[in-house]
Amino acid sequence: VTLHDARWRGFASDNYSGILPEVLDAIRAANGGHQSSYGADVYTQALGETIREHFGPHAEVFPVFNGTGANVVALTSMMPRWGAVICSSSAHIHTDEGGAPERVSGLKLYTVSHEGGKLTPASVATQAYGFGDEHRAQPMVVSITQSTEVGTVYTPGEIRALADYVHSKNMLLHMDGARLWNAAASLGLPFADFTTHAGVDVLSLGATKNGALGAEAIVVLNPDAVEGILYLRKLSMQLSSKMRFVSAQILALFQESVGITAATHANTMAALLRSTLEDRIAQGAITELAFSYPTQSNGVFAMIDLEVANRLRQKVRFYNWDESRGEVRWMCSFDTTEADIISFVDLIQEELQA
């Protein structure tokens, strides 16, 4: 029984969208009969082979339920109890995971300022000190997000520069890839070019935001970077007994460019939203709206009067990003349509002129 109005659309989150038809088909195909549990199934084996094809021969995959779980298990496996993570002040692990890294694993997070959502060797250096000082939690991992929390995308060169600096300090580089497909679509590059070959040690690979039902994974690119990850996944309650259904979802995104096609569409819709707004601004039809960051993936960040935003939100759902400066976030998904964009821009124009 369908309980919701399937015509209802929003720009709050790519998590609001449904499931890609190909992913639903993959779940159905994995159903029926018996398969070994806890990852000893043919779908998880096939996913491992696919991951190695895309990320290199040493890559190893560990499917989990959600992004917070992927980040917590990955980071915990990368350091001892006295370790600390350096991350952006806007990092998901710092702002949107309910304190899970600290509460579940006891990790210390050192936050640093960001430039358009990105870390640089210079910003990391502000917390990369005190090595060997027993009074200071030891910086051992740097975590970056690709694409970033504000919709920008690291280039391979930027990641390589970070990795070189991080490794020179005997630290490791973790990438939160909740929207990795959107980054790949934006860059037009194979995954390995901005992960494995750029010096990333461990990756949290997202799928849910790109059309999966509920599937993420930890991808270990440097086998020497983790310890005890199998046990940590279990004790962190991220080990699925019927893992074939998790693995099948991620596998479906890699087959026949399903994931890249979906992410490309979401990115294209975000670019259309921005360009349509820019056209209205140039025509003088929209005023008092400005953009916060470049639109490089599937999110548009804008500055708008919050009273106007609140009125808009009565008709179309979206989130405030930084209320202190009147910043909002508009996210596009694999199923966002051009009609959705035009209708939303018309509403923005109408409310700004009210």
Where are these regions (language model features)?
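Conserved PLP-enzyme active-site core in the AAT-like
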Residues: 2-315, 320-336, 344-352
